[in-house]
Design a protein with these regions (language model features):
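Active-site loop of classical SDR/Rossmann-like NAD(P)-dependent oxidoreductases
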Residues: 189-201
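Contiguous beta-strand/loop segments that form the cofactor/metal-binding neighborhood of enzyme cores
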Residues: 89-166, 198-211, 246-247
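Beta-strand-loop-alpha-helix segment that lines the small-molecule cofactor/substrate pocket
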Residues: 1-29, 44
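Short polybasic amphipathic segments
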Residues: 148, 164-180
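Alpha-helical elements of Rossmann-like donor-binding domains used by nucleotide-donor carbohydrate transfer enzymes
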Residues: 10, 36-39, 91, 120, ...
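Predominantly a Rossmann-like dinucleotide-binding segment in NAD(P)-dependent oxidoreductases
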Residues: 21, 28-113, 238
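C-terminal helix-rich "cap/oligomerization" subdomain common to oxidoreductases
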Residues: 12, 17, 126, 205-247
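Short, mixed charged/polar active-site loops
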Residues: 130, 156, 184-188, 213, ...
């Protein structure tokens, strides 16, 4: 929704003042694979969650960045975390819960750009769970993986593929009717964008007609933006950064 924390806050404030809706696209939440994972968490099937890891191993050659002047810039794009991995960073809070703190490292290892092409973020959730976000745009020779793995007291699951489109591991101490949907929830895709956008826009239309509440509004967008900004502050200053940020 923004590349700067204060810009995101200002967007929410001004929309509130004007009495208009602010919608933020979070299409990955609509994936059938992640809907199953979300329900498993909500139903307590994991028990206590111990660890969660997100991997975004994609490829963006120099020609991609050279193709448009805004790409690879701090002002208009952001780096691998802010741009390509932002929808995966969104899963950190949406699935596992509020984050206590982050410790991040970012680097520009191969591309001629202002921003990072590679990053890793250590995460501690308020629940005590630990995990990481690992991102690179340098995967050879093409996009390899967009995944989330959750390890808990009573269950382990991995949703992977190139764009969280395949349930690759699904094992719990108990059984649930959702277990029968695991195979059908997975799908093949050649696009990292998935197929969640139509369902997102369906919610937007319903909201504008007064038939629903916005599922991903401006305040929801701030949750992942806050985590992103905290990660950049951590990498810049070489320290652990606690959340929430100062408003």
């Amino acid at each position: 929704m923004a590349t700067r924390w204060q810009d995101g806050l200002e967007m929410v404030r001004r929309c509130d003042q004007a009495g208009v809706q602010l919608f933020v696209v979070k299409q990955n939440r609509r994936n059938a694979t992640l809907q199953l994972l979300k329900r498993a968490i909500q139903r307590g099937r994991f028990g206590r969650i111990y660890m969660a890891t997100i991997n975004v191993f994609w490829s963006r050659p120099q020609s991609y960045y050279d193709g448009a002047a805004w790409r690879g810039t701090w002002e208009f794009d952001g780096g691998a975390l802010m741009n390509q991995a932002s929808h995966y960073v969104d899963l950190v809070d949406w699935l596992v819960g509020p984050v206590e703190s982050v410790q991040a490292y970012v680097a520009t290892l191969a591309r001629n750009i202002q921003v990072e092409d590679t990053a890793t973020v250590g995460v501690r959730w308020r629940s005590g769970a630990l995990g990481s976000i690992n991102v690179t745009m340098l995967t050879y020779p093409k996009n390899l993986e967009g995944s989330i793995t959750i390890i808990g007291e009573k269950g382990t699951a991995k949703v992977g593929g190139v764009a969280v489109n395949q349930i690759q591991h699904w094992e719990f101490a108990d059984s649930d009717p959702d277990d029968e949907e695991v195979r059908s929830a997975s799908y093949e895709t050649t696009s990292v964008y998935g197929f969640g956008h139509p369902l997102y826009y369906e919610n937007v239309v319903k909201v504008l007609r007064g038939a629903a509440h916005a599922e991903t509004d401006g305040r929801e967008g701030l949750r992942s933006l806050e985590l992103l900004i905290a990660s950049y502050i951590s990498a810049r200053d070489g320290r652990r950064v606690a959340l929430p940020l100062e408003y």
